[in-house]
From Swiss-Prot:
One of its GO terms (biological process) is dUTP catabolic process. Keywords: Hydrolase, Magnesium, Metal-binding, Nucleotide metabolism. This is Deoxyuridine 5'-triphosphate nucleotidohydrolase. It is an enzyme of class 3 (hydrolase). This enzyme is involved in nucleotide metabolism: it produces dUMP, the immediate precursor of thymidine nucleotides and it decreases the intracellular concentration of dUTP so that uracil cannot be incorporated into DNA. Its EC number is 3.6.1.23. Belongs to the dUTPase family. It catalyses: dUTP + H2O = dUMP + diphosphate + H(+). It comes from the Bacteria. It holds the Pfam family dUTPase. Substrate binds at residues 66-68, 79, 83-85, 93. Pathway: Pyrimidine metabolism; dUMP biosynthesis; dUMP from dCTP (dUTP route): step 2/2.
Amino acid sequence: MKIKLEIKRLPHGANLPFPSYASEGAAGMDVVSAEDVILQPMQRYPVKTGFAVAIPNGYEIQVRARSGLALKHGIACPNAPGTIDSDYRGEVKILLINLGSEAFEIKRGDRIAQLILASVTQAVFCEVTDLDDTQRGHNGFGSTGI
């Protein structure tokens, strides 16, 4: 299934590719940086992409790290997956953190993250006095194994 997304190029996004799928079976669209940045170890930074997008109601865009950057350099999205809500119209920025031990240079045009379009189901809470019993019950963290 394909969903149409309206995208607005911002002035500092000139000549950059819009997010795109690297292969036919890819779930995530690669997104590139619209600026040069040097991320120091443990530094967090919202990297500009040079575009804004109109996401249809009932959808979100999830922001996830690129596996190669995470494996080779420790570059991650600290709030992964990040969420871009359907009512947001500002510039898409990618929050990155350098978990590596060396400074990491991002150049304008470098692929920095993946964007995944996902459907959203909103919950409606109904207060009750009791919940049904399950085998797991109140057992929390680590209760099903490590």
